[in-house]
Structures are given as structure tokens and as C-alpha cells.
UniProtKB/Swiss-Prot annotation:
GO molecular function list: nuclear import signal receptor activity; nuclear localization sequence binding
Chain segments carrying region Disordered: 1-36
Protein's recorded name: Importin subunit alpha-2
Keyword Endoplasmic reticulum among record annotations: no
């Protein structure tokens, strides 16, 4: 993911003058930047991993007549040329059915649409390009005309859905169909037709920012919001999925527009309150993008029941596809608005206990994304009050974080390091060095975390190395009986710091040299 934001370089005059802010900054002060970068990266992540940005519709929508029919055996081993010929013929049949009149014409239209749809739905040979070159899209637009039967509209929208699931240029071919697809999202359309049109729109929105802008300009947001209220689970899920594709950014305009639509927050809450985990998953992605891109959205969401509902899911669910957006949405909210930590995650209330339990579950997961995102969320909570620090420190999170900072991948080490660092300091509220919570520092160092921080000092990433240096300063300044420098030396910390002696980054050079001079100068070791 391209969602890692950098912490400010430490001050050369006072290495930890703003230590709380320095530790906190990578996840709070520059949280908006990281959240926006996430919104860009998530689309690619969903396409390649658990939740695809574009989806082929192979099975009939529940409730349609086709769901009750035998699909018939497709001959899957036909040669590509034969299937392409069938596709071109199916498009010709579409054209022919539009030109005839009289008895049986409607049946012929449906049969022609269904033949094309079945060919576009089969997974063995991609036939979208063949259909487009044969002229399918403008014909399908005609089949979407108002006054057509629901069955015809459904089949036409289904064909367009699978064309939109193709390659980028294939998806762009749907531009002439977008106004009618959006129009059929309206209240006068049947639920089946509206759902299929939402699916097609979701595929188009999943392709890129240019097509999303077109959909927004043509008014797709409001009818999709209405569909999220549908009592039919698959319709609400499809609408939420299409919505998340539509607002994913990087332009925040769509997210800011969405949060102003009457009822959208109520729709999100109502969806999260249902037992439907698939619906909750899609709606959680909507929350992810709103919390990544819209400051107004963040303010409204944190003051609603959404955080409590997300925490409930985090605490109770073992569904990875649900946990990822739930955790990321919570992480965004915690990073973006102090209200989340100060007024929602109040120590002594059940909600913080549930949140901490859910975060620890994710920390211990084998899934890399869950470990990283839970560390990020915890680092922000740990940057809160002394009570929050004590609660996290006393929990199972601390030994797990120590393990992560010493043995995991680089990005997870860094997030875990921010959390552990924040557990060790209390801000003074002025320009002085932060007060060290000695009990926490000693336990974390004695628990084996120091080698992990020295490893960070050796990082090629300057900001990560700065984080490691900041923690070494805490150890050397705050470990009892002036044993901190010796502990750092025993783990080859001096050598790690000396690599910055002639470093091109002046702030890092001054910080590292200042620490070496202060703690390992001429008087070092004389007390022994």
C-alpha cells in the first residue's frame, strides 16, 4: 500500500522537543495525507486482492425469472474462434430484433439479449472486445429505452455490466449508456433493474477517476444512496459497493458531496445494524473512503453511532473481508479527530475495552494488513491521555507489539514502534522534553524491544531512522540508574547512530551526533 506518511524530522536543537508530536505525527498530524494516499491505493488493492473493483455478473440476480430457469450447458471447450463467431452473431440478432415488428418480437429481443449475456458471462474466453467491435454497446443502449419491459432492461443492463468488467478501453465504451443506466436507478424502476444498473455503474466507477467524474456529473450519487435503503439485501450491497467505487478518490469531491445528501448517514447506520456481513463489508468501505477524503464526513461520522457499530464488528467478527475495511475505517477516524479518542473511546467504558480487544485480535492475526492497520490505530490511541496509555500498556497488546517491532516487515515494525514510543511519554504541554513514563519504558526495553528500535535507526528511510533515534534518546535519558547508554551500547546502538555522522540530512546528522556526544562523550564509563 502506498499509505505510509512520514514523520517530521526531529529538531536538531532539542532532539525530542516535540517528541509526542513527532511520534504522533506520522499517524495524526499528517493523517490527512496518509488517509488520502490510502484512498488511492485501496482501489488497486481491492482489484487485486479480496474485493475486486470490478465484478462480472455470472449468476442471475436473486428474484429474477432467470434464477428459476435452467441455464443450459455452455460448451466450455469450444475454440475461441467459434465463440467469437457466436458473439458476433448474437450482436447481429440484437440488431435484427430491433428492426422487426409484429407478434413474437419481444420474445426475440429477450432471446437475443440472453444469448449475448450468456456469452459475455462465460469465464473461459474473453468476448467483450468481440461484442464491442460488432457494435453491441449502441444496440444495448437502445434496449435500455424507457417503456421497455423489466426483463429486457435487466438483460440489457446485465450485458453492459459484463462489458464494463472488461479492460479499461472496453469499460470506456459504456459512456453512451451511462445516462440511461443512471436513470434506471430511479424510484420508478423495478428493484431488479435498478440493482443490475447499479452493478454496471459500479464496474464503470471502478475503472478510474475520469469515468467517476463523468458519473458524478451525471448525478449517480443520489439514486445510489436511495438504493442503499433497499430491503433487498443484494440491492443494498450492490449499491454500497458501487458507491464505494464512485467516491474512492483521489479527488475528495464525491465524498464531500455524498456526506451532504440527506439520509446517507442514516443509510450507513441502518446497514451496519443489520446482521448481513456482506452488506456491512460494502458499507464499511464507504466509511473508509468518507473518512479518508472528507473532513466534514469525519466530523459527522465520529459523532454518530457508526464508531460503536464498527467497533462491535471489530470485536465480534472473524471475517477477514469485513475486518479489513472496519479496521481501516476506525483507524482513519481515530487518526483524524481527537473526539474519537477523547469522547468515544473513553477509558472505563465498555467501548474502549471492546476496541482494544478487537485491535489485539488483529495484532495477533497472520494477516499483514490487519497487523499494520491495528498498530496504526493503537499508536493514535496511545498518543492520547495517560489513562489510555496505561490501559494499552497493561493489556496483551504490549508483548505483541514488542514481537512485531523486532521481527516483522518494515512497515509493521514502524507502526508498532510508534505505539510503543507513545506508551512511554506524556506530553508536557510546552516546549520541554516530554515526561517519560519510566515503568512503561523499563518494561518495554526489558521485554526485548530495544534491538527492534536500533534496527529502525539503520533504516534507509530517514523518518523511520529518526523514530528509532527518538526512542534511543528516551532509553538513554530515562532508564533508571543511568543504565540506558550501556543498554544501547550493548545492542550496537553507537555504531547505528554513528552512520549519521556525515549524513546529508542536517537534522538527522545533528540529532545523532548530539546524542552520541551527550551520552558517549569523554565522561562515558568513568562512573564504572
Amino acid at each position: 500500500m502506498a499509505d505510509d506518511s512520514a514523520s517530521p524530522s526531529p529538531s536538531s536543537a532539542s532532539p525530542l522537543q516535540h517528541h509526542r508530536e513527532a511520534l504522533k505525527s506520522s499517524v495524526r498530524n499528517t493523517a490527512a495525507s496518509r488517509r488520502r494516499e490510502q484512498a488511492i491505493a485501496i482501489g488497486k488493492e481491492r482489484r487485486e486482492a479480496l474485493i475486486r473493483a470490478k465484478r462480472v455478473c455470472r449468476a442471475p440476480i436473486s428474484g429474477s425469472d432467470e434464477a428459476e430457469m435452467e441455464e443450459g450447458d455452455m460448451v466450455v471447450d469450444e475454440e475461441k474462434a467459434c465463440l467469437e463467431a457466436k458473439t458476433a452473431h448474437a450482436v447481429e440478432e440484437l440488431k435484427s430484433a430491433l428492426s422487426i415488428q409484429g407478434k413474437g418480437v419481444q420474445k426475440k429481443k429477450i432471446e437475443a439479449l440472453r444469448d449475448l449475456r450468456r456469452l459475455l458471462s462465460q469465464p473461459e474466453v474473453p468476448l467483450v472486445d468481440t461484442a464491442i467491435k460488432a457494435g453491441a454497446v449502441p444496440l444495448l443502449v437502445q434496449y435500455l429505452s424507457f417503456g421497455s419491459s423489466d426483463e429486457q432492461l435487466l438483460e440489457a443492463a446485465w450485458c453492459l455490466t459484463n462489458i464494463a468488467a472488461g479492460e479499461p478501453e472496453e469499460t470506456k465504451s459504456l459512456l453512451p449508456a451511462l445516462p440511461l443506466l443512471i436513470a434506471h436507478l430511479g424510484e420508478k424502476s423495478s428493484t431488479l433493474v435498478a440493482e443490475q444498473c447499479a452493478w454496471a455503474i459500479g464496474n464503470v466507477a471502478g475503472e478510474g477517476a475520469e469515468l467517476r467524474s463523468t458519473l458524478l456529473a451525471q448525478g449517480a450519487l443520489r439514486p445510489l444512496t436511495r438504493l442503499m435503503f433497499s430491503s433487498k439485501g443484494s440491492t443494498a450491497r450492490t449499491a454500497a459497493w458501487a458507491m464505494s467505487n464512485l467516491i474512492k478518490g483521489p479527488d475528495p469531491k464525491a465524498a464531500n458531496e455524498l456526506i451532504t445528501i440527506d439520509g446517507v448517514l442514516n443509510a450507513i447506520i441502518a446497514s451496519l445494524e443489520k446482521e448481513d456481513e456482506e452488506l456491512a463489508t460494502e458499507v464499511a468501505w464507504v466509511v473508509v473512503y468518507l473518512s479518508a477524503l472528507s473532513d466534514r464526513g469525519i466530523s459527522l461520522i465520529v459523532r454518530s453511532s457508526v464508531p460503536q457499530l464498527l467497533i462491535g464488528r471489530l470485536f465480534s467478527s472473524e471475517n477477514l473481508q469485513l475486518l479489513i475495511p472496519v479496521l481501516r475505517g476506525l483507524g482513519n477516524l481515530i487518526a483524524a479527530d481527537d473526539y474519537m479518542v477523547d469522547s468515544v473511546l473513553t477509558v472505563g467504558h465498555n467501548i474502549i475495552d471492546q476496541a482494544l480487544s478487537g485491535l489485539i485480535k488483529c495484532l495477533k492475526s497472520d494477516n499483514r494488513v490487519l497487523r499494520k492497520e491495528s498498530s496504526w490505530a493503537l499508536s493514535n490511541i496511545a498518543a492520547g491521555s495517560f489513562e489510555h496509555k496505561k490501559l494499552i500498556f497493561a493489556s496483551e497488546a504490549t508483548p505483541v507489539l514488542i514481537r512485531l517491532v523486532t521481527s516483522m516487515q518494515f512497515d509493521i515494525r514502524r507502526e508498532a514502534a510508534y505505539t510503543l514510543g507513545n506508551l512511554c511519554v506524556v506530553p508536557t504541554g510546552n516546549c520541554e522534553l516530554p515526561k517519560i513514563i519510566v515503568e512503561h519504558l523499563v518494561a518495554i526495553v526489558d521485554g526485548g524491544a530495544l534491538p527492534g528500535f536500533i534496527h529502525l535507526v539503520r533504516s534507509a528511510d530517514v523518518d523511520t531512522a529518526g523514530l528509532g533515534l527518538q526512542f534511543l534518546e528516551l532509553v538513554m535519558r530515562g532508564y533508571p540508574n543511568k543504565q540506558g547508554p550501556k543498554l544501547v551500547e550493548m545492542e550496537d546502538g553507537i555504531e547505528a547512530m554513528e552512520r549519521f555522522q556525515f549524513h546529508e540530512n542536517e537534522q538527522m546528522r545533528n540529532m545523532a551526533n548530539g546524542l552520541v556526544d551527550e551520552y558517549f562523550g569523554e565522561d562515558y564509563g568513568l562512573d564504572e
